[in-house]
Amino acid sequence: MRYTNYFIPTLKETPSDAEVVSHQLMLRAGMIRKLAAGIYNYLPLGLRSIRKVETIVREEMDRAGAIELLMPSVQPAELWQESTRWEQYGKELLRFKDRKDAEFCLGPTHEEVVTDIVRREVKSYRQMPFNLYQIQAKFRDEIRPRFGLMRGREFIMKDAYSFDVDSSASDLSYDKMYQAYRRIFQRCGLKFRAVEADTGSIGGSSSHEFMVLADSGEDAIVSCTQCEYAANVEKAEARPAPAEHAEPRPLEKVETPAKRSVEEVTAFLGIPSSALVKTLLVVADGTPVAALVRGDHDLNEIKLKHLLGCETLEMANEEMVTRVTGAPVGFAGPVGLNIKIVADLAVQGMKNFVTGANAGDLHLKNVTIGRDFTPTQYADIRNVVHGDPCPRCEAGHLELWRGIEVGHVFKLGTKYSEALRATYLDADGKEQIIFMGCYGIGISRTVAACIEQNHDADGIIFPIPIAPFHCIVSAVNTKDAEVMAACESLYLDLRAAGVEVLFDDRDERPGIKFKDADLIGIPLRLVVGSKNLADGKVELKSRRTGEVELLPLAGAVEKVRNIVAEALGR
């Protein structure tokens, strides 16, 4: 492709409303343009990278035995009402009525639709297993769309759904998809982690998220330094702390005037935050519950919600705290509370700790479990922290990372097939419920996450597999006939060798051309100038390393072809 015949509207300045690097660079590189809040046009360069990701996804899904189909974006309300998600999904589900007053939604996901297809067509165990997938634009009406393609309202997604006769067969389908996802993100050239995760609104028994590692990532993840354990911080398990062996000291009430926070109380009393236990009041389905965590730990509301088995969980407001404890916020404690108390495992072995006294400006010292109060139950309800011992092995400890979720695989079990009555007849002629899995990849989000991980001050640094072009040929002086002839020859020969090449044939200063090439992130740059050409040489520069190599003109195409072939695993 010749630059003068292509559409690359680059920007010199960063738009003021672009907050994260990927959004800034995709706008500046002419890859996307905003149409409305959270809705973007994919311009030619951006679409090329998206198509690269789609191709890798299709190849690996096909390799894993999945079958492509395409389902409508518009879905009837009846299906969502059958699964009960019409009420549960909330305002992210864009709902509307047609001219006959029938209700529909714009699909954010397709569990209901694909289950409806299968319940109509599958009758026997002999028709399974199979896996159906599609690549399609989805819509979720995010309350605050931001960060460009990272959190848009419309986005391109690959969603797949497996159908099996039982749980063990479904586990095999799940593992196939898990391995396919690993291959997909490896082929995209990304550094990532597959982590244990919460199933969220999709539901099901278990799931894994695929996280691209990036300092700007919204999600916190942990991994072990010694074994393969990795999890989203919402799901990560904490190993119980060893019990303290100190003798209990007498309970003591101390004045802590206007000292509410952990930092204020511990500084005032001269103790470490690990010697204080926070009493956090939550409301679970309308019922107050006290959650106890160490002062240097944070409550994991998702763990607590699963433990309590509630539909809704929220922090108690000031009025509720005062009504339950008799004290203002900041002075709650477990001693004397007449509600359910859930204590974190790290609290279980503690003695002589500090808590609120359920009275304003007062705390209790030397609180001891068993003597002063007894929790209703102990459970892992905290977020892990950097350096925690690994819950799976004896040797390792947990490291914290930031990540961007680009893929998620779920074991759905019979959640949707039971709700929509998707059944089959087994070998004995008995009716059974179909077991399902679902598997999503954010195609457009993967491109944005790649940029978050791969950039510098000059622009994007695309990995070769998903770069819009593999190589750019830059003519230093377009008025030099020999330079242009050499560029033309390189351009045609690179194309013939299977290299995707952009020929920058613009009549611009070399500095402008080089800046644009760096901004766009094309991995390899061949520079043809009259001085080097007089010696039969051209310059090859790596966008990632910045290394420059002078090559014989005759060997330049072979060199580039080999670099590209190695990166693509050809």
Curated annotation (Swiss-Prot):
Catalytic activity: tRNA(Pro) + L-proline + ATP = L-prolyl-tRNA(Pro) + AMP + diphosphate
Subunit organization: Homodimer.
Record remark on domains: Consists of three domains: the N-terminal catalytic domain, the editing domain and the C-terminal anticodon-binding domain.
Task performed by this protein: Catalyzes the attachment of proline to tRNA(Pro) in a two-step reaction: proline is first activated by ATP to form Pro-AMP and then transferred to the acceptor end of tRNA(Pro). As ProRS can inadvertently accommodate and process non-cognate amino acids such as alanine and cysteine, to avoid such errors it has two additional distinct editing activities against alanine. One activity is designated as 'pretransfer' editing and involves the tRNA(Pro)-independent hydrolysis of activated Ala-AMP.
GO cellular component: cytosol
Principal location class: cytoplasm
Listed CDD domains: ProRS-INS, ProRS_anticodon_short, ProRS_core_prok
Organism: Geobacter sulfurreducens (strain ATCC 51573 / DSM 12127 / PCA)
PANTHER family in the record: MITOCHONDRIAL RIBOSOME PROTEIN L39/PROLYL-TRNA LIGASE FAMILY MEMBER (PTHR42753), PROLINE--TRNA LIGASE (PTHR42753:SF2)
Keyword Nucleotide-binding belongs to the record: yes
InterPro entries documented for this protein: aa-tRNA-synt_IIb, aa-tRNA-synth_II, aa-tRNA-synth_II/BPL/LPL, Anticodon-bd, Anticodon-bd_dom_sf, Pro-tRNA-ligase_IIa, Pro-tRNA-synth_IIa_bac-type, Pro-tRNA-Synthase_IIa_type1
Family to which this protein belongs: Belongs to the class-II aminoacyl-tRNA synthetase family. ProS type 1 subfamily.
Gene Ontology molecular function: aminoacyl-tRNA deacylase activity; ATP binding; proline-tRNA ligase activity
UniProt-recorded name of the protein: Proline--tRNA ligase
Enzyme Commission code(s) on record: 6.1.1.15
HAMAP family attached to this UniProt entry: Pro_tRNA_synth_type1
Residue ranges of the region described as Disordered: 238-257
Cell compartments where the protein resides: Cytoplasm
GO BP field: prolyl-tRNA aminoacylation
Pfam families: HGTP_anticodon, tRNA-synt_2b, tRNA_edit
UniProtKB keywords: Aminoacyl-tRNA synthetase, ATP-binding, Cytoplasm, Ligase, Nucleotide-binding, Protein biosynthesis
